[in-house]
Regions:
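Bacterial N-terminal signal peptides that target proteins for export
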Residues: 1-7
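C-terminal end-of-chain detector
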Residues: 2, 323-324
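Bacterial N-terminal signal peptides
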Residues: 7-15
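Active-site-adjacent loops and short helices of periplasmic peptidoglycan-processing enzymes
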Residues: 20-184, 194
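Penicillin-recognizing serine hydrolase domain
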Residues: 25-31, 39, 128-323
Length: 324
């Protein structure tokens, strides 16, 4: 039986509409991913491949790029100063430190503000500074923030984050600037970032004193971590994020003491254990993360004791390279 052309068009259009609706419904649901960082073992996953905005979890990529730049160039982030650019006036939103164009702070203090308190202007200031350095070293010209965001996207590609696109260094939604990721991709990014000691040192702090140098002199601020799990036993980071489009989000890294086992030859071997938990769009994200941490360990330890069997590597293991 042959359908008229108009019927085929109608069927195709209906199928497209149904697909879009399914994608929209998936984006309205919670997305979660729980994995063990060293083995790459996926422990719990739900809606983990749904593309959606991730709000300030974007700053994990910003922080990783900044730390990688500092390592590659031998920059001491505790002493190197950055200037707040004129473009901060275009960001909008809260400005808790009253940052003004021309204000200065160290790279590390700016990263404390961006990664702990999720300060968008601090994130933009880091991006502007590092972007200018990258442009200069590459003998190029252009928008420094755009250069920095390009570096974020290159990092994402190198990590296999195939469902991710960054549009800015802070994660705020902007008209015409489509940005998205998935719980699985954020987990990849979190594994990578938490391999960097300088990054980990920053995101595990509960609070930190920082100084902003302005026209009228230095101003001191206490920066507090927006991650409610910070300071709890074993918690190493990572980041929170919330916008109206993304909903409440969090990525958490937790570490346990290595598991020591006796080998057949009588020697002992230690297996490091580190969980990455990503929760996207859950109004009770911190309680959910705590529950998933318990669930993750309940799956991982028996799996490891059984010899870490893998039947389908593509589905069961997330391999995160270290391109740097």
């Amino acid at each position: 039986m042959f359908l008229p052309k108009w019927s085929l068009v109608t069927v195709a259009a209906l199928a497209t509409c149904m697909q879009v609706r399914a994608q929209d419904e998936a984006a309205m649901q919670e997305s979660i991913m729980v994995m063990e960082a060293y083995s790459g073992k996926v422990l719990v996953a739900s809606n983990a491949a749904a593309k959606r905005p991730i709000a300030s979890l974007t700053k994990i990529a910003s922080g990783a790029v900044a730390v990688d730049w500092a390592t590659a160039t031998g920059t001491d982030i505790s002493t190197a100063r950055i200037s707040v650019p004129q473009t901060v006036t275009l960001v909008g939103g809260p400005n808790p430190m009253n940052l003004q164009p021309g204000d200065q702070m160290t790279v590390r203090d700016a990263l404390y503000a961006a990664l702990l308190a999720s300060d968008n202007l601090a994130a933009l200031s880091v991006a502007d500074h590092v972007g200018r350095e990258l442009i200069s070293r590459r003998g190029k010209s252009g928008d420094p923030v755009g250069e920095f965001v390009g570096e974020m996207n290159r990092l994402a590609k190198s990590l296999g984050m195939t469902q991710t696109r960054f549009a800015n260094p802070h994660g705020l939604e902007r008209p015409g600037a489509k940005a998205f990721s998935t719980a699985a991709d954020v987990a990849r990014l979190s594994v990578y970032a938490m391999r960097r000691n300088a990054f980990t040192f920053i995101v595990r702090q509960k609070e930190r004193q920082i100084t902003v140098h302005g026209a009228s002199g230095p101003r001191n601020y206490t920066i507090r971590n927006s991650n409610e799990l910070a300071g709890e036993t074993g918690i190493l980071g990572v980041k929170t994020g919330t916008t109206s489009a993304a909903g409440p989000c969090v990525s958490v890294c937790m570490e346990r003491d290595p598991l020591v086992r006796t080998k057949p030859d009588g020697s002992k071997g230690a297996t490091p254990r580190r969980l990455i938990v990503v929760v996207l769009n859950n109004p009770d994200r911190f309680s959910r993360a705590r529950s998933l941490i318990r669930q993750g360990w309940a799956v991982y330890d028996p799996w490891l004791s059984a010899g870490a069997p893998v039947k389908d590597k593509r589905r069961e293991i997330i391999s995160v390279p270290d391109p740097s």
